[in-house]
């Protein structure tokens, strides 16, 4: 009986882990961020700051398969946990 119970627990844990979907912050608004579930294959969240002028930055957040490449005057942070790109 104990073996059956242990087997069911292990199977449940494995099945739950296979269905995991990463959630990243998507909205560009600092004050009212929204989130999105990342599609299959996109296992990273990113946040990109782009320098526009002194004290002025544009930023973008979302899901990515790989960390986006920084362009001129960009700062990019990538991470792999839920809503880590706040």
UniProtKB/Swiss-Prot annotation:
Residues 44-63 are annotated as: Finger loop 2. Its main location: secreted. Residues 66-78 are annotated as: Finger loop 3. Expressed by the venom gland. The keyword Signal applies. Residues 1-21 form the signal peptide. InterPro entries: Snake_3FTx (IPR003571), Snake_toxin-like_sf (IPR045860), Snake_toxin_con_site (IPR018354), Toxin_cobra-type (IPR054131). Disulfide bonds join 24-45, 38-63, 67-78, 79-84. The keyword Zinc does not apply. GO terms for cellular component: extracellular region. It is found in: Secreted. Residues 23-37 are annotated as: Finger loop 1. Negative results: does not show interaction with adrenergic receptors (ADRA1A, ADRA1B, ADRA1D, ADRA2A, ADRA2B, ADRA2C, ADRB1, ADRB2), dopaminergic receptors (DRD1, DRD2, DRD3, DRD4, DRD5), histaminic receptors (HRH1, HRH3, HRH4) and serotoninergic receptors (HTR1A, HTR2A, HTR2B, HTR2C, HTR5A, HTR6, HTR7). Does not show interaction with muscarinic receptors (CHRM2, CHRM3, CHRM4, CHRM5). Binds specifically and irreversibly to an allosteric site of the muscarinic acetylcholine M1 receptor (CHRM1) at subnanomolar concentrations and shows a very slow dissociation rate. It also inhibits agonist-mediated guanosine 5'-O-(3'-thiotriphosphate) (GTP-g-S) binding and downstream signaling, and decreases the dissociation rate of orthosteric antagonists (N-methylscopolamine (NMS) or pirenzepine). Is a potent negative allosteric modulator (NAM) for CHRM1 activation and a positive allosteric modulator (PAM) for antagonist binding. The finger loop 2 blocks access to the orthosteric site of the muscarinic acetylcholine M1 receptor. Comparison of MT7 alone and MT7 in complex with CHRM1 shows that finger loops 1 and 3 undergo large structural rearrangements upon binding to CHRM1, facilitating extensive interactions with the receptor, while finger loop 2 is mostly unchanged. Belongs to the three-finger toxin family. Short-chain subfamily. Aminergic toxin sub-subfamily. This is Muscarinic toxin 7. It comes from Dendroaspis angusticeps (Eastern green mamba).
